[in-house]
C-alpha cells in the first residue's frame, strides 16, 4: 500500500512541477513587505495582495477558502469531525528586499535547479507546497477524519498579529505544523528578546547614521555622515569614504543573514561603529553611546553585553543589531536576541543595562519565552517517521533559534522544508539575505513528506 501511495505522489509531483513553480513565481512577484495599515489591509497593501492571490490559487485547485477579516486566511478540505481539525500554516509576507541583489528580488529566477527571489524559501515556496498537498488529497478523493486547513499568514515577519487574531476568533487546530524552518522536526524554539539602544541628543560630529532593513536581519550595509575632512581619514577593510556636503559619508559593507543564524555574517553597522571609534569621530557623548553599541556588535553570542549563555536543548544565545537610525537627533540601534532556557527576558534586560551604563538607554523591550514539546508525542513521531522514511535518514527532532508561528499554538511544531546542511550556490543567498535561494528538488521532496505526514496525522486520536 505504501509503495502504491509513493508512486501516486511521485506522479502527482511530476505532473504539477511546472505549475508549482509558476504559482511560487506569482507570489514572489508581489512585494508583500509590511506596510502602513489601510482599510481592509491591517498589515498593508502588499501582504493583503499576497493573501488574496494565495486564496485565489487555492480556489483554482478546487479548495474551499476563507478570508478571515483580512487578517489571515485558509484553504480547507472537509472532514468527518465537526469540531477538531488539523492545520498547516505558512506566511506570504516577507522581509524587506534589502541590498546586494544581482536580480530583481520580486521576479523569480531559476538557475541550476534553484529558485531565486524574495520569499522562495521564506515562506512563499512552502506555502504553495502545502496547497498542493491538499490538492493531492482532494484529487485522490481521500476521506478525511479531520478537516485540514492550510492557513495563510501575512504578518509573520514582524508581529504575528495575524495568528493572534485567528486564535482569538477561531478555534485552534488539534495539531499544526509550519513549514517555515528546517527538517526534520523542530519541537522547540528559543526565547525572543528585542529592544533598542538609544543615545542622548549629542549635537556632535555624527550628523546621520543609518543601516539595516529589518530588526531580525543582519545588515550588509550601513553609513554614517560625519563632520570632518576626508583627507584626515585612513582606509580600512570593508569601509569606503565619500565626500558629502561639508562632511564625509562613511560606508560599511558586510554580509547579511537571518538574526537567528548569524554565523558567517558580517554586521555593517558594527564595522561603521568600530571605524568611528578608532578614528575619534565622535564627541564624548557620542563615544559613550558608540562604546555601548560596540558591546552589542562585538559578539553574536552576547559576550560583550555579558548575556552569553547556553543550554543542552537549545545551545547558545544569539544577538544581533539589526537597524540603526537617527530619530529626533538621537541614534537608535535595534537588537534581536534568541535565548535558551538558562536565562529570561528580565535577566537579559538587567544585564544589558549594567553593561551599557549611562552611555545608552535600553528602551522598547519585549520578550517571549522559549517553548518546548516532548519529542515522543504521537503527532511529532508521525512527522519525524515520515521524514526519515522518505529521505532514508535516521534524524531526530531538534530545536532552533528562529521564532515561528508554532509557539502560538497549543500543539504545534515547525517542519521543514530547509536543511541545515544545505550548501548554497555562489549565486544564492540565505533567507532574509540578498539573492534568497531555495532548491527545487528539496521543495518537491518536502511536498511528498507533507502529504504522507498529513495522512498519518489523520490516523491519530487527538
Located regions from the model:
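Active-site metal-coordination/substrate-binding segment of hydrolases
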Residues: 83-152, 158, 170-171, 428-442
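Zn-dependent metallopeptidase/amidohydrolase metal-coordination segment
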Residues: 12, 385-460
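Short amphipathic alpha-helical face segments that pack within enzyme cores
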Residues: 125-136, 270-274, 445-452
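Acidic, glycine-rich active-site loops and adjacent beta-strand->loop/helix elements
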Residues: 92-94, 148-159, 179-184, 213, ...
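Acidic-glycine-rich active-site phosphate/pyrophosphate-binding loop
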Residues: 95-110, 192-193, 198-199, 242-252, ...
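Midchain, well-structured core segments that form catalytic/ion-binding scaffolds
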Residues: 157, 164-341
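Substrate-recognition/cap regions that form aromatic- and gly/pro-loop-enriched pockets
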Residues: 326, 331-402
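Acidic/His- and Gly-rich active-site-bordering loop/insert found
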Residues: 2-118, 142-144
Amino acid at each position: 500500500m505504501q509503495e502504491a501511495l509513493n508512486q501516486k505522489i511521485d506522479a502527482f509531483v511530476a505532473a504539477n512541477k511546472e505549475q508549482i513553480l509558476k504559482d511560487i513565481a506569482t507570489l514572489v512577484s508581489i512585494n508583500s513587505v509590511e506596510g502602513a495599515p489601510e482599510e481592509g489591509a491591517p498589515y498593508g497593501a502588499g501582504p493583503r495582495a499576497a493573501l488574496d492571490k494565495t486564496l485565489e490559487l487555492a480556489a483554482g485547485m478546487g479548495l474551499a477558502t476563507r478570508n478571515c477579516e483580512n487578517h489571515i486566511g485558509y484553504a480547507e478540505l472537509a472532514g468527518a469531525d465537526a469540531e477538531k481539525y488539523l492545520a498547516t500554516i505558512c506566511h506570504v509576507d516577507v522581509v524587506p528586499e534589502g541590498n546586494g541583489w544581482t536580480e530583481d528580488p520580486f521576479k523569480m529566477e531559476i538557475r541550476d535547479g534553484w529558485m531565486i527571489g524574495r520569499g522562495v524559501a521564506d515562506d512563499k515556496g512552502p506555502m504553495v507546497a502545502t496547497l498542493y498537498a491538499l490538492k493531492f488529497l482532494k484529487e485522490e478523493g481521500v476521506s478525511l477524519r479531520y478537516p485540514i486547513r492550510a492557513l495563510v499568514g501575512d504578518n509573520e515577519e514582524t508581529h504575528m498579529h495575524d495568528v493572534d487574531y485567528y486564535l482569538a476568533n477561531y478555534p485552534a487546530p488539534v495539531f499544526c505544523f509550519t513549514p517555515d524552518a528546517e527538517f526534520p522536526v523542530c519541537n522547540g524554539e528559543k526565547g525572543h528578546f528585542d529592544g533598542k539602544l538609544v543615545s542622548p541628543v549629542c549635537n556632535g560630529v555624527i550628523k546621520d547614521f543609518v543601516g539595516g532593513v529589518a530588526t531580525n536581519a543582519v545588515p550588509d550595509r550601513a553609513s554614517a555622515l560625519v563632520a570632518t575632512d576626508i583627507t584626515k581619514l585612513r582606509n580600512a577593510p570593508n569601509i569606503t569614504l565619500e565626500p558629502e556636503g561639508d562632511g564625509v559619508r562613511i560606508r560599511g559593507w558586510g554580509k547579511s543573514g537571518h538574526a537567528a543564524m548569524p554565523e558567517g555574517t558580517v554586521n555593517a553597522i558594527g564595522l561603521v561603529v568600530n571605524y568611528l571609534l578608532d578614528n575619534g569621530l565622535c564627541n564624548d557623548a557620542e563615544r559613550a553611546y558608540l562604546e555601548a553599541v560596540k558591546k552589542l556588535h562585538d559578539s553574536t553570542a552576547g559576550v560583550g553585553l555579558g548575556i552569553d549563555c547556553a543550554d543542552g536543548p537549545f545551545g547558545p544565545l544569539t544577538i544581533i543589531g539589526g537597524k540603526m537610525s537617527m530619530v529626533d537627533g538621537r541614534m537608535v540601534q535595534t537588537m534581536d536576541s534568541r535565548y535558551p532556557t538558562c536565562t529570561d527576558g528580565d535577566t537579559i534586560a538587567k544585564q544589558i543595562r549594567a553593561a551599557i551604563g549611562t552611555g545608552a538607554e535600553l528602551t522598547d523591550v519585549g520578550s517571549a519565552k522559549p517553548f518546548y514539546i516532548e519529542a515522543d508525542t504521537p503527532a511529532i513521531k508521525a512527522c519525524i517517521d515520515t521524514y526519515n522514511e522518505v529521505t532514508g535518514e535516521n534524524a531526530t527532532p531538534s530545536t532552533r533559534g528562529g521564532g515561528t508561528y508554532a509557539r502560538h499554538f497549543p500543539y504545534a511544531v515547525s517542519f521543514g522544508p530547509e536543511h541545515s546542511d544545505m550548501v548554497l550556490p555562489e549565486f544564492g543567498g540565505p533567507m532574509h539575505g540578498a539573492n534568497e535561494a531555495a532548491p527545487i528538488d528539496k521543495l518537491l521532496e518536502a511536498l511528498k513528506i507533507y502529504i504522507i505526514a498529513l495522512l498519518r496525522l489523520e490516523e491519530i486520536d487527538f
